[in-house]
């Protein structure tokens, strides 16, 4: 079991997170001792969790048209300016119209970038595994740093963030498997085009033999809830099914994984590094297998098309067509899903231990790079993150995406 994990090295005085905590003492009104207030977590939640949380959790902004964050955020104007900055010689903002997948996909098969001007919600999970073998040190700090950064710099309100950490008294705020899955559903529920959702996981990651044949290396990536010994792990396929598949065109989900073997933790098909594109799907082949029809019917809201395609799936699958049974559905999405992670899937658990891949490296480098220059393109940010990581770690950053990404566009969130 433990050979799937890295052991976190003692950070001593060198923990990189200290650097940005010292530069910007976060004015956290709740203090780091207590959890931030989380409506819907106090009492056992009604309607199986996040259905109808109390006030402030999911209220639409007032119908003024210009109050981007429901009028709550004093820093709103400064953040909205991203777009005007983008034209002054900086990277261009994302296009507002749908973009074709191209690369052999059927005509009309498209996705949409999010302008990230809508509602914002964040789910941050940090697990130190207190009292368990393989206890980690910095994971809870990672997500507290990230929540402060999102709140101060990107207009994420505290009441629209859920933090699951294993130092909290409230059982609903413990990062158990049930709580994590429930929170993932809450995160994506009712998301609209141009919303910006954020997911951060800091804890143990590992690999398990891939049962559905969709991973090239024969392993699925997994994350380990605090109660994994009783409840089991959570596989990348399940995270994709809950957090990626339901998203409509134009919804952004940004994910950051601070864990070993997180390179494909959301099962996204396009992977970019500082060197350019590392991996892209064979869409012509997927189209030939009928895999792309389901997504585009879903994106159009054409449920009748979806049902008939799905029935076609079943018929062919029962004939034993291996490709159909294997890659149940394409991993592309009409939404705008991106994921930042360190290193590569191919890194073995032994390499991870020898390389001392430290939990927290990715989120620390992400925050540090954006603090130094908030106006970067995707490829500039990849390079900035690589430069930050190179000062302390051997791992390289990679950016995975649900669609082909124009890496020269302005990075927005």
UniProtKB/Swiss-Prot annotation:
Q: Does the keyword Metal-binding apply?
A: no
Q: Mind telling me which GO cellular component terms the entry cites?
A: cytoplasm
* Family to which this protein belongs: Belongs to the peptidase C14B family.
Query: Polar residues compositional bias: what residue ranges?
Result: 75-85
Q: Molecular function terms in GO for this entry?
A: cysteine-type endopeptidase activity
State the organism's lineage: Eukaryota, Fungi, Dikarya, Ascomycota, Pezizomycotina
Instruction: Quote the catalytic residue positions.
Output: 204, 260
The organism sits in which domain of life?
Answer: Eukaryota
User: What organism does the UniProt record list as the source?
Assistant: Aspergillus fumigatus (strain ATCC MYA-4609 / CBS 101355 / FGSC A1100 / Af293) (Neosartorya fumigata)
- Keyword Lyase assigned to the entry: answer is no
Q: Which InterPro entries match?
A: Caspase-like_dom_sf, Metacaspase, Pept_C14_caspase
Q: Keywords, A to Z?
A: Apoptosis, Hydrolase, Protease, Thiol protease, Zymogen
EC number from the UniProt entry: 3.4.22.-
* Protein name from the UniProt record: Metacaspase-1A
Q: What does this protein do?
A: Involved in cell death (apoptosis). Required for the apoptotic-like loss of membrane phospholipid asymmetry at stationary phase and facilitates growth under conditions of endoplasmic reticulum stress.
PANTHER family in alphabetical order? METACASPASE-1, METACASPASE-4
Regions of compositional bias (Low complexity) in chain numbering: 49-58
Q: Which GO terms describe its biological process?
A: apoptotic process; proteolysis
Q: Where is the composition biased (Pro residues)?
A: 36-47
Annotated stretches, region: Disordered:
1-104
């Amino acid at each position: 079991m433990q050979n799937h994990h890295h052991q976190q090295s003692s950070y001593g005085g060198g923990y990189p997170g200290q650097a940005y905590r010292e530069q910007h003492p976060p004015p956290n009104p709740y203090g780091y001792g207590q959890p931030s207030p989380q409506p819907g977590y106090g009492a056992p939640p009604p309607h199986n969790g996040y259905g109808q949380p109390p006030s402030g959790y999911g209220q639409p902004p007032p119908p003024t048209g210009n109050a981007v964050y429901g009028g709550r955020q004093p820093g709103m104007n400064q953040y909205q300016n991203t777009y005007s900055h983008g034209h002054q010689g900086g990277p261009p903002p994302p296009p507002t119209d749908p973009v074709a997948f191209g690369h052999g996909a059927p005509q009309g098969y498209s996705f949409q970038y999010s302008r990230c001007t809508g509602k914002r919600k964040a789910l941050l999970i940090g697990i130190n595994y207190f009292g368990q073998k393989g206890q980690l040190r910095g994971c809870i700090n990672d997500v507290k740093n990230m929540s402060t950064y999102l709140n101060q710099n990107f207009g994420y309100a505290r009441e629209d963030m859920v933090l699951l950490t294993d130092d909290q008294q409230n059982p609903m705020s413990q990062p158990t498997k049930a709580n994590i899955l429930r929170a993932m559903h809450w995160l994506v529920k009712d998301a609209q085009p141009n919303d910006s959702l954020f997911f951060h996981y800091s804890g143990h990651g590992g690999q398990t033999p891939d049962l559905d044949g969709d991973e090239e290396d024969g392993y699925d990536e997994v994350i380990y809830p605090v109660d994994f010994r009783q409840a089991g792990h959570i596989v990348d396929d399940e995270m994709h099914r809950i957090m990626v598949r339901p998203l409509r065109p134009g919804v952004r989900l940004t994910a950051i994984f601070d864990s070993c073997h997180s390179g494909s933790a959301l099962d996204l098909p396009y992977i970019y590094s500082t060197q350019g594109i590392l991996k892209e799907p064979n869409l012509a082949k997927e189209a030939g297998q009928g895999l792309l029809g389901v997504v585009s019917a879903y994106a159009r809201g054409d449920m009748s098309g979806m049902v008939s395609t799905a029935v076609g799936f079943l018929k062919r699958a029962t004939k034993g067509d291996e490709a159909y049974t294997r890659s149940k559905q394409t991993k592309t999405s009409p939404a705008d899903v991106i994921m930042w992670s360190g290193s590569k899937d191919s890194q073995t658990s032994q390499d991870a231990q020898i390389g001392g891949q430290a939990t927290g490296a990715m989120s620390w480098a992400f925050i540090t790079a954006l603090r130094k220059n908030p106006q970067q393109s995707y490829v500039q940010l990849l390079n900035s993150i690589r430069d930050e990581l190179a000062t302390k770690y051997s791992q390289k950053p990679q950016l995975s995406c649900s669609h082909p990404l124009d890496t020269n566009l302005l990075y927005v969130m």
